[in-house]
Amino acid sequence: MMNPSTILSALQWAEDTFGSVHLGDVRRTKRAVAIACAIAQEPAASLPAQLPDEAALEATYRFLHTPDVTYEQLIAPHIAQTRAEASKQQQVLLIQDTTEVDYQQHPTTTGLGPIGNGSHHGYLLQSVLAVVPESREVLGLMHQEPFLRQPAPKGETKRQRAQRERESQVWERSVQAIGTPPDGVQWIHVGDRYSDMFSFLSQCRQQQCDFVVRAAQDRCVDVLVEQANAPVPPRSHHRRRAGQPAAAQPQHLFEVVRGWSAVGEQDVHLEATKQTKARVAHVVLSFGCLRLLPPEHQQVSQGRPLVVWVIRVWEPEPPEGVEALEWILLTSVPTATLAQAWQRVDWYRARWIVEDYHQGLKTGCSIEERHLQSYEALRRLLGLLAPTAVRLLQLRAVARETPERLASEILPTDLVQVVALLAKVPAAALTAQQCWFAIARCGGYLRRRSSGPPGWKTLWKGWFYVQTLLEGVHLATRLSLN
């Protein structure tokens, strides 16, 4: 991650992130930096609000509609920086997820595709965030792909459907695009139930990466782990075989792991979702090693099973009226001890960071509120907003990860002085946590016992309110000097 001073300065951050972008003309590079700086100062605002100068605004619209500028060019320096940082770590989680970007309120934008149940239009976005496991430090985007949903042709046959590229293949493309880690570095792909595809898991191993995914498919398994990935005969593993020992008989994943006894227990904090509040769940855990047998069609695996460690986490006594938690996790990382099993669970729990990133992109950067003429123009804007949303996560982490650290050690002195006045705390004693909540209160956050951490809207509304006050202080200082 960049040092805090670079992250905190919109101009320094924009120059560091976009100053090396290759757009065929140095003037375009300068324009990219200028637009990114304006966006970084107030990410949730509209382009006219971010660029009040009419000439600068017109130049920005021309930039976003220039065919010679692409999303891939704009995002490339950020991806390269993230990869360089991820190559320095011993272990990195590559957390992957898909989200829908909805432009239903902008019906005149051309080139978009169907999303949801088909009644709305927009595009899909696959993001892979690089995160350090222990500290949860967000290094940046390792890969990102915006794409359009392709409706199935009318009258499509079963064979044609099998040959057509599937939307789910974006998970495999991401693994291929990221590739193999350097020697001595472990990259671990983390995904939810949508990532439970045999082809995705196989692709991770082909790229010498590991994985932790939540199981969705009740696959055929056996316990012949000593045979590793030795090919199994086509179709034979999908039916019981007479005359073979019980260990060699195919079984189903969920039935097997739900028969394992608990070997540990722990309290786990669950992040809030759209349907549920944040809570602490008391869970138990069991784990073991199995072989996942390949699908019947064989093409994705050449008949080779995958040896995986399976970790089941479940809530034996959930609160009344609350659905019990159960995660069945598959990992390629050898798991021999209880401590290692809990660590794999902790890796999976880091998944919320990519969801938070997408929320930051939508709420913190108002990506769905942007009104441009075409999907291609929106892609170019995404090339500027995607790293901006990473910066929002990193800005928040500066205060969250060191709550008792003095705010003056990580934030500009003048900003700390303004917040200290608002919080009615001496600037020299203001901690990062106090500063964080004082800024959020400026955005309407009410800190109650039942309240979770500040949301994107209140946090950034407060941040920009403080920035406005700070600009007023600077202006008043200049006027007094004159």
Residue ranges of model-derived segments:
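Single, function-defining residue in the core of a domain
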Residues: 2-110, 117-124, 129-482
